[in-house]
Amino acid sequence: MAWVAWFTGLPGCGKTTIAKCVKLNLIKKGIDVKILQLDEIRRSITPKPRYTEEERDIVYASLAYMAKLLSEAGVNVIVDATANKRIYRARARELIPDFREVFIRAPLDVCMAREAERITEFSPKGIYKKASDEKAAVPGVNVAYEEPLAPEIEVDTTKMDPAQSARFIAERLSNPEK
């Protein structure tokens, strides 16, 4: 059975950038990994997302189940998803035998600045602006983001750049006893 590392943090904290770098670091170590990016998968589950509480419940449960199936097939998985409520991550932990929570920490103002500059294919852009206009429910602004209480791995992206964060995380994922 393979492991699942769930990257959580506010939108714009660097989850996607770091996840891609971690994957490259792990491949160099001979460890194959698949990234499940919520922003990409959400479009299959909810083609016209409304980001409601009910929709989030369905999307996060589906994502956790996909990760479980892949890990049972021997595929290591990085889940790139905010999962703003602890219960979403707790349910995934209950479902997946080798679950590792990875907290990508960054203050809201830093996340907002990064998100405003975001260039991406799948991740929504301008979500913090929409939240300030009350057009969207955004974790950290008008919907709570519940930080992990005891993540297996934590990085602060105001203290480490993406490459440093990725090396730190990849080392812990490849040697969990560290």
Model-predicted segments: where are they?
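Walker A/P-loop
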Residues: T16
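Hydrophobic anchor at the beta1->P-loop junction of P-loop NTPases
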Residues: F7
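Walker A (P-loop) ATP-phosphate-binding motif of ABC ATPase nucleotide-binding domains
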Residues: V4
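Conserved substrate/cofactor phosphate-moiety recognition/catalytic segment
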Residues: A19-K68, E72
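Conserved phosphate-donor/acceptor-positioning beta-strand/loop module used by diverse small-molecule
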Residues: D80, L95-E115, V155
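The conserved Walker
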Residues: P11
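Loop/turn-to-beta-strand initiation segments
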Residues: D32, A73-V77, R100
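Small-molecule kinase domains that catalyze NTP-dependent phosphoryl transfer to phosphate-bearing small molecules
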Residues: R105, R114-F168, P176
